[in-house]
Amino acid sequence: MSRTRLLALLLTFALVLAACASGTDEDDAAAGGDGGADLAACPDPIVITTDWFPESEYGGVYQLTGGEGSIDPESGAFTGPLAYGDVPRQVEVRAGGPFVGFQPGSALLYSDDDILLGFVNTDSQITLADSQPTVAVFATIEVNPQIIMFDPETYDWESWDDVRESGAVLLTFGGAFYTDYLIATGLVDAEQVDPSYDGSPARFNAENGAIAQQGFATQEPYNYENDFEDWGRPVDYLLIQDSGWEIYSQALAIRPDKLEDEGVRSCLGALVPILQQASVDFMEDPGPTNAAILQAVIDLDSFWVLSEAGIE
């Protein structure tokens, strides 16, 4: 399955779920309801923080500007005019990862009051519920695309049952909650997990297949085979979801205290349907927004790379 088809499938599942869950009076009240929906109640700019560099996995959010806008290479903030509705607003989509010290979305929502929505995963929401509670308002992806990828010439893993016996090191980001689950269930040994991953391909390339590494099914397998010349060959992977760790990945969330504000609720009543429509529009015609995402990555000029062929 191509990268584009896989991403579209993941996004489609999320949109079907959103449609099925949006028809009751109780749900309408929680989101502000059609009667209270007011885009003019939204802040200007509308700030949304992601958890990584610009990429198509956030296509529905970048689509809010219809492909218009530019990125600040220093801050990683992409800014452009809202292309939906009749209320003039600027949209600011902030890159995550190294631009924010690899902080999770929950932490960013509490450290910067200007941020309206941030990307969070279910596992981090549960873990941080006491100290940094969040409420998800839109599931952008239904099937968690997180993976552990590996060199098929080194390891012939067919399922998670093969990983522990191999003794392979799993290079992950620090604070990846699924690693605690993998250890607790005996799928891997604690000493196999190395939480020093910084998002760069350098370590995986240098180890020449000796280690496994976290990634996204919709991103790294293509990049390593086609865009990262130091590797330049296929990788295989196991989905984290197939280990039994089933979460919503990259849901857009807000601080619960902000939901007590009637204006914020009215804003969300208008903005969430726009986010849904933008996601549909991105799947139907991703070209302009993908071009903007690709240009943003070029302008950032970092270790993270995308190609025109890859982003399609």
Per-segment meaning from a language model:
Residues A37-D198, A202, I211, G215, ...:
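Short, glycine-/small- and polar/acidic-enriched structural segments
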Residues M1-L7:
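Bacterial N-terminal signal peptides that target proteins for export
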Residues T140-F150, E229-D261, L268-V272:
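Periplasmic-binding protein-like
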Residues E260-E312:
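Secondary-structure end/capping motifs
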Residues A21-A31:
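Bacterial lipoprotein signal-peptidase II cleavage site
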Residues I46-V47, T134, S166-A168, E207-I211, ...:
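Second-shell loop/turn segments in exported
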Residues A14-A19:
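C-terminal motif of bacterial Sec signal peptides marking the signal peptidase cleavage site
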Residues G59, I126, D161, A176-D180, ...:
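Solvent-exposed, polar/charged alpha-helical surfaces in well-ordered, non-transmembrane soluble domains
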